[in-house]
């Protein structure tokens, strides 16, 4: 499974499961699950709200990581297949 592979890669670098990379990875998994759920259940407004909240949390973590360590940020978005956000 991709999650186990990614966890092993991160745990080799750091033993901290609360790292920004791991949190972004778990939020990305939740986002993908909610997106597939919402494709079937279009009128599930509570799930839509939850998805927007998780997207905001992930965005804040990614912007923090981009400010602190640009190299780790680039590696992470490359591994997860996330587009780079536009800076305001």
Swiss-Prot record:
PANTHER family tied to this protein: RIBOSOMAL PROTEIN S15, BACTERIAL AND ORGANELLAR, SMALL RIBOSOMAL SUBUNIT PROTEIN US15M
GO molecular function: structural constituent of ribosome
GO biological process, one term: translation
Assembly: Part of the 30S ribosomal subunit.
Matching CDD domains: Ribosomal_S15p_S13e (cd00353)
Record protein name field: Small ribosomal subunit protein uS15c
Cysteines joined through disulfide linkages: none
Similarity section: Belongs to the universal ribosomal protein uS15 family.
SMART domains hit by this protein: Ribosomal_S15 (SM01387)
Gene3D superfamilies, per database record: S15/NS1, RNA-binding
Keywords: Chloroplast, Plastid, Ribonucleoprotein, Ribosomal protein
Localisation per UniProt entry: Plastid, Chloroplast
Record's GO cellular component terms: chloroplast; ribonucleoprotein complex; ribosome
């Amino acid at each position: 499974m991709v999650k186990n592979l990614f966890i092993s890669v991160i745990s080799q670098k750091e033993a901290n499961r609360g790292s920004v990379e791991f949190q972004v990875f778990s939020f990305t998994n939740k986002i993908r699950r909610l997106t597939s759920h919402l494709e079937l259940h279009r009128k599930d407004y509570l799930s839509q709200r939850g998805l927007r909240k998780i997207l905001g949390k992930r965005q804040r973590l990614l912007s923090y990581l981009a400010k602190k360590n640009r190299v780790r940020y680039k590696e992470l978005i490359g591994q997860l297949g996330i587009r780079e956000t536009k800076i305001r």
